[in-house]
């Protein structure tokens, strides 16, 4: 959630998914690159905790829209704005390491070294891709 390329890709991906909502399923995997993004793990944990209350995507969007403010103050502010149960949110944030670890292990197993990273019907692409690039890949792999 701290990666500027991920933020750019996020906006493009939202457009793509909105256009093809009946044709694609978006699966999100956490891969916080903590050596270069010190808030990445904390943000991932907060998003996962929000997901336990059915608000992952709303929380995810809020994090990217306020990427320059990442930190505990923002995480709680977003949780409040989304009307999350704050006690459950805080409790779930402490349990997330085991939940996010499989995503990290999968990325490492696949040899992923950076984000954003995408797989569409077996085709791999990465970076802050343009909508036209995603459309081209989508039509090729259908």
Model-derived features with residue positions:
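C-terminal cap of thioredoxin/glutaredoxin-like
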Residues: 5-17, 76-142
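Structural alpha/beta surface segment adjacent to cysteine/selenocysteine redox centers
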Residues: 1-80, 113, 139
């Amino acid at each position: 959630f701290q990666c500027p390329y991920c933020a750019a890709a996020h906006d493009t991906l939202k457009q793509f998914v909105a256009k093809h909502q009946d044709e694609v399923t978006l699966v999100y995997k956490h891969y916080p690159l903590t050596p270069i993004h010190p808030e990445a793990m904390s943000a991932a944990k907060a998003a996962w905790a929000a997901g336990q209350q059915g608000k992952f995507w709303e929380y995810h969007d809020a994090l990217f829209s306020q990427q320059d403010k990442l930190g505990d103050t923002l995480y709680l502010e977003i949780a409040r704005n989304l009307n999350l149960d704050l006690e459950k949110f805080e409790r779930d944030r402490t349990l997330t390491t085991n939940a996010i670890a499989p995503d990290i292990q999968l990325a490492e197993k696949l040899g992923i070294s950076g984000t954003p990273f995408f797989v569409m019907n077996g085709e791999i692409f990465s970076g802050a891709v343009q909508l036209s690039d995603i459309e081209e890949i989508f039509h090729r792999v259908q």
